[in-house]
Each structure stands twice: as structure tokens, then as C-alpha cells.
Amino acid sequence: MSRPEHIAPPEIFYDDVESKKYSSNSRIIEIQTKMAERAYELLAIPETAEGLMLLDIGCGSGISGDVISDAGHHWIGCDISQHMLDVAIDREVEGDVMLRDIGQGFPFRAGTFDGAISISAIQWLCNAEKSHHNPRKRLHTFFQSLFNVLTRGGKAILQFYPENSAQIEMITASALRCGFSGGLLIDFPNSSKAKKYFLVLFTGNNNIMPSAKGVDGAEEYEEEDDNEVKYSNRKRDRRRVTKSKGSAQHKTKDWIMNKKDRQRKQGREIKNDSKFSGRKRGPKF
Amino acid sequence: MKILTHNMMACTKKQCMGKGFPLKVECTEQIVLEQEFNYEFTKNIYPKLDWAGIAEISKKFNIPIQLDTTKHSLEDEEFLKTLHSLLCNLKVITGSLTCPNCQRVYPIDKGIPNMLLREDEIYQDIKE
């Protein structure tokens, strides 16, 4: 899998072209919405609660924000890419967005937000994009600031794509050091495609970790991602069929003549054509 | 940027910790939205508001609102409606925000405040 954070820093990678994808590509929108819905579910906001104030970290074009708006809450989003935010403004999202590097912390007063969600953003913090960047320090600033802007009893659900176990450890350790309790939750741990990492963080202590989805592997097939696997399997099967059809035509007279021509053109030494070339042999005794 | 967001914001340079708000608003272009009054939201947000910030906005945009917090009542629907429309319906499109403590200016363009800090400003933070 290609990792965008290896290509360029976020404010450069999510340029005009890449940002437009986020408003037009239905597949991207679907995946982002699914993850945002799951993150919102993990926040476990009681159904009666309405009109809360949530923070969207790395909001991008506001796809995840729409999920919050639909649930009847207000949100403020931060992102480092100007182009992504322009897309968000064009889409007329309900929340407010601002340009901010989350590695510098959040520009809010303490205790402002009842919860926070983040979709595929915090792995960007693990890379040093500029000479003065120090990933550990930036993660520390990020979590410390996040802890401050959340109300006591607030929750943060951060979905991310870790590159390796060292990154997971760096992120989780940094969060716990800043006073959060909670831990990592992995949905569909046995599937390479549907597997999703969520960092579930609480500012208070008396919280129960929610349970992961698809741990026993049985539920997994309900996921959209796996439908896609089935589909690609079908495709592969079809490809196999056409290939075997190709091998049926294999070694007919036409095929042999073609091959001899090709090889002659390549300058190889080829036997002359005769009336016996490519002719069926008689029955064997 | 809605006034609600402005009310929550603060300057994050280290020397401004705890005193970098309310940010001073300069506004050259604004729009007025028409959002439905949301009682639950207004009630939830009320304890989190910074009244110094509200006072400033109320003066700046000439929207009269009861500023004496001892006289507020969450049963008074008229008051809540004014508060809600002040917070959610007024949107700054172009302008700037100034930190009252360090005088740093954050520009607002197309409704997006640019809160990025420069390298030297972060470095300043680390040193202190």
C-alpha cells in the first residue's frame, strides 16, 4: 500500500488535484464516512444528548464533519491543507474550519470540547517534514493540547494508519503520558483490508473500553470492504477463464506460424515453413 | 469563521498561555446566516462561553445582548435566541484576529482563519 506521508508533507500532498478527489470520488467518500460513523459510534454519546461541541482533527474536506452534523452536534475542524479547507468551504459544511498544524497544538481555550474525532490524520505526526520537526515532541504537544481542550469526561477517538508497531507504541505511549486513559482498539484484526486502528482516549478514569468489531472473524463478511474482495475474486476468476481459453488456441497452426514469424523478426534461427508445419500428428498406436 | 468559534479560540504561543483570549476581531467582510434556533445547543454551550469575548463582539457588530451574567436565565427564550443568533448566524469571511497579549495577527481569508505558527514562534515556545 502506498503511504501518502512518504510522498510529501500534508500541506503539499493535499494540493488542488488531490483535494478535489475528496469531493468527487465516491469510493473515498464512502470509506471516510464509514470510518467517521464508526468513530462517532465509539464516542458513545447518549442518544438523548444533543447539540454538543465536537472537535474534528484533520477535518480535510469535512466528510467526517458531516457525520457529526447529521447526528445533530456542532463541530470545529482543524487541518493543515489550505486546498482541503477550500473544498470544505465549497461544500458548505456546517461546522467551522481553520488552518492549523495539529503538531503545534490547538488554538482553543481549555475545556471547550465534549469530544474529538480524527480520521486518518495522526500518522502524519510521526514524520519529520521540516528540519525543526521532532515527531516525539510534536506528538506530545498534540496530546497535551488535546487533553486541555477536552472537558473532563470527554473522549477522543483517533483513527489512524500506523506504519509499524514502533509507531503504534510511540503514539499510544505519548497519549498515556499526557494524562489520557484508554488504549488501542483494532476492528477486524484478522483481515488485512478491513483492519482499522482506533485510539480510544478518555480524560477521566472510570471508563470502559468499547469492544472491537469482527474479532472472531465471522462478522467480517458483513463489511463493505470484503464485498469488494469477493468482487475482485470474481474478476480474477474471469481472467483465469480467458487465459485458459487462450491456451486452447495454443499450438494451432495459426499460432505456430505467428510465433515463427515473430521469432524470425527477432533474428533467431527458425526452421523453414513446410507442409508439415503445425500439422496434426496421426493417431498413436 | 463563526462567532462561536471565535469565542472558543485562544492564542497558543506559550507566553500567551491562559491569557491569549478573547482575540480581537477586525472584519472587512461578513455574512449573516439563517440557522434555526437550537435550544439544547445554546443551553449546553452557555457555561463554556467567555463573556469578555461576547461583550467585544456585541460592541463591534452592534448587537445588543444582556452582558450581566447574574441576570441571565436559561428559561428566558428571548435571551437564548439572541445569544444563538449572535453565535451561529454571524460569520466573518475576511478580516483578522489579533492576540490581546502578544499582538500576533492571524489573518482570516474565505472564512478560514490561518492559525499556523511560524518556525521561530514555535522555537520561542520551546525555549521558554
Language-model features: where?
Chain A
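Conserved class I S-adenosyl-L-methionine
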Residues: 1-49
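Class I SAM-dependent methyltransferase SAM/SAH-binding core
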Residues: 53-105
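A short acidic, Gly/Pro-enriched loop at the edge of an enzyme's catalytic core
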Residues: 103-116
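A short beta-strand submotif of the Rossmann-like class I SAM-dependent methyltransferase core
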Residues: 118-121
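A short glycine-rich, Lys/Arg-flanked "PGG" loop and its adjoining helix->strand segment in the class I
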Residues: 134-152
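Conserved beta-strand signature within the Rossmann-like core of class I S-adenosyl-L-methionine
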Residues: 153-160
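Conserved S-adenosyl-L-methionine
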Residues: 180-191
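C-terminal lobe and adjacent flexible extensions of AdoMet/dcAdoMet transferase-like proteins
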Residues: 195-285
